[in-house]
């Protein structure tokens, strides 16, 4: 099962190919009448502008309506769609050769635009950012992190002296990126890769075990970063202005974290 969220809607995709579309405002009532359809998707299905963006056959992203029928708009080449996220600019898919940006044009039609990866570092498989901001970030192999300014359609490589395992763009005026390194430290990087903030190792046990490392999640808001710690059963709330751990929530078994409200 895979959930993909955009704005006030979430698609839940099952291995059978069934897609359930959830409207957040309706979740307090019932989900019995929510749209359900079966699609042959090879990646995350993104709800966007009252349509669904569907990676198909591993090579393109098609646009369908909420009934599953083809909808007006441009399909886009995308091999190996591995992730999808929304920004203030539009919906972004992570593909083998780069990102693909979908935007809504005047009149409602959707347009697709490729943003190819530069060649100086491995491409990310996921891109993450603060909700409703113009930037996304992802890990660039063992070299550092990629920062994607979606508004400018520009990639910036943030080199790191230690490998990184998570990267999330803040999308603020300073174009900062919050990352988790292989030692379990949270760092805040400037657009040139300078380390502005560095914490003590917070997740030493979690990052040392591959199975637990895969469960670690990092999400950010305007003031804090939230970091799950599966080994200790905790979630750390970190002030990303100075690296101070503001709070730690304990007695948990964190598998998924999402900001709401």
Mark where each language-model region is.
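Repeated scaffold domains used in trafficking and secretory/extracellular systems
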Residues: 1-8, 36-50, 75-89, 120-133, ...
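Acidic, serine/threonine- and glycine-rich low-complexity intrinsically disordered segments
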Residues: 54-172
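Structural recognition of the beta-propeller blade-terminating site
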Residues: 21-26, 62-67, 102-106, 149-151, ...
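Blade-level signature of beta-propeller repeat domains, shared across WD40, Kelch, NHL, RCC1
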Residues: 230-261
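Short beta-strand elements that form the blades of beta-propeller/WD-repeat-like
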Residues: 2-21, 44-62, 84-94, 98-101, ...
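Feature marking well-ordered beta-strand scaffolds used for ligand recognition
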Residues: 10, 18-32, 60-64, 69-72, ...
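A short beta-strand motif characteristic of beta-propeller blades
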Residues: 1, 27-38, 69-77, 110-119, ...
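Intrinsically disordered, low-complexity segments enriched in Gly and acidic/Ser/Thr residues
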Residues: 147-230
